[in-house]
Amino acid sequence: NLVRVNLTNFSKNDKKVVLLTQTYPSPTSKEIISEFLDQYPNISHVTYDAISDSSTLDAFENIYGLRAMADYDFSKAENIISIDADFLSDWQGGGYSSGYTMTRVPDKSKKKTMSYHIQFESNLTLTGSNADDRVPARPSDLKKIVARLYSKITGNGEVKGSLNPTIDKYVDSCIDKILKSPNKSVVVSGIDDSDVQELILLINKSLNSEVIDINNPRLIKEGDNKKLNEFISDLESGKLYGVITSGVNPLYSLPNTDQIKEAFKNLEFSLVFSEKEDETAKSAMYIAATNNYLESWGDYELKKGNFFLAQPTIRPLFDTVQFQDFLLKVLNSDLSFYDRIKSNWQNRILRGKTWGKSLQDGYYNDFSSLNLRAQKTR
């Protein structure tokens, strides 16, 4: 009731409040948050990923209209050209090593050829140490390499500035290999620049690469650095009257935390959902003790068309509340988060499959929901 009264007063007076959360790749959570924002139009939602992939997300959204990240199946690759992408580590969520190793084992029968992997990078990485050719390059040269590949493969644009002769030789060699088997080749990059990431997507589109999957992309992150920077600016300038956080600890993970901490303490209202009294919780007016994930219901769509259910393994041990259940109470709903998950799945996700069967299996696949086409070319 206290939270509802505060939020209602802020809404009546059009005082700006921000809901700052982690990425929730949960269709039901997104639905509840959307209803919450509809009831309180003065509240804006900002998604914050402590380890950001905002540039990659921006690029994919600009070209394909969905805030997501392309997925890759390296088991289909004959040529892998990586520009500062440590994809054998935690690049874009990780999980690529198994597909990569499938084409890296010599075949004694010689019926299958090993994939060729070249790594252009400014610092030694796990992926670079496993490459057939590792080419050290300055960060400024890495962008030129991407531009050169784009220009040669798509036939668009001109590249200004020259490359080191050794690097130039490797780039030309890459282009020759790619053009011999374009649909079995892939170009990836870890450069934190949305323009570079757009070029990477357009290169792979031009190659008609079978390695990249844009129709069922990864939805594990949604953070937007532009919105985050706007939030920080509004917080420090006193334009915000309230902040609600869930699943994030910005006073630990953001830079310049002393200045942000001081601004956070000057808010008229601050509510932190947290399992422990972390740095952000200590500076908040109110702390809402949340369930551990082992005590919680949840649904997830980590990859487009792949839906998963999470069931609690134990009852809540303490007097805690799940973030989604709290929002439902603020919305005066009699339903629990579990009830909403069940209703949402039955009405919007399941196609002829029963809820009980999905609950037993723990997942449901629907690959008919999306067929993305490029909305932008260069």
Model segments located where?
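A conserved hydrophobic secondary-structure block that centers on an alpha-helix together
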Residues: 12-47, 51-55, 77, 90-95
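Extracytosolic ligand-binding ectodomains
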Residues: 4, 100, 371-374
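Generic alpha-helix structural propensity
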Residues: 2, 27-31, 325
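Hydrophobic face of alpha-helices
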Residues: 4, 30-33, 146, 200
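Non-catalytic alpha/beta scaffold blocks inside enzyme catalytic domains
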Residues: 10, 48-355
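Long, low-complexity segments enriched in small/aliphatic residues
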Residues: 343-378
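Conserved catalytic alpha/beta cores of large enzymes that bind or transform nucleotide phosphates
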Residues: 3-5, 10-11
